[in-house]
């Protein structure tokens, strides 16, 4: 099963167009990153990148890029909405002013 971490890693590689540059950005080894991408490719049964310099997306990679971008966006949105349900005051804005100034405004 493809997980969100692998999708995130894929998107960073696609943006960087390099496994080594993406690995540096993610603070992981290039071997670890390659293993995550290989896991996705094995699971879906096709390559996502043309291993040229710079890396380019295959047609399947382009489709996966669109889907992964959308899924990660929806996941982040859902997490924010759920957090707002759990803690509605989390994103509230508080303004502090002195009593004298508040009276003058009212």
For each predicted feature, which ranges?
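Residue cluster at the C-terminal edge of the helix-turn-helix DNA-binding motif
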Residues: 16, 25, 38-47
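Base-recognition residues in the alpha-helical recognition helix of bacterial helix-turn-helix
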Residues: 8, 35
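N-terminal winged-helix
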Residues: 30-31, 80, 86-106
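Residues within the DNA-recognition helix of helix-turn-helix
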Residues: 29, 36
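Alpha-helical linker/hinge and terminal dimerization helices associated
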Residues: 43-44, 64-86
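Short helix-boundary/capping micro-motifs
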Residues: 11-27
């Amino acid at each position: 099963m493809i997980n969100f971490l692998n999708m995130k890693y894929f998107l960073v590689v696609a943006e960087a167009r390099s496994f080594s540059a993406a690995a540096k950005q993610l603070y992981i080894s290039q071997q670890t990153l390659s293993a995550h991408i290989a896991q996705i490719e094995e699971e879906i049964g096709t390559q996502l990148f043309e291993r040229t310099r710079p890396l380019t997306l295959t047609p399947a990679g382009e489709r996966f890029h669109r889907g992964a971008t959308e899924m990660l966006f929806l996941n982040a949105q859902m997490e924010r909405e759920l957090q707002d349900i759990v803690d509605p005051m989390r994103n509230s804005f508080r303004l502090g002013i002195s009593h004298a100034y508040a009276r003058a405004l009212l």
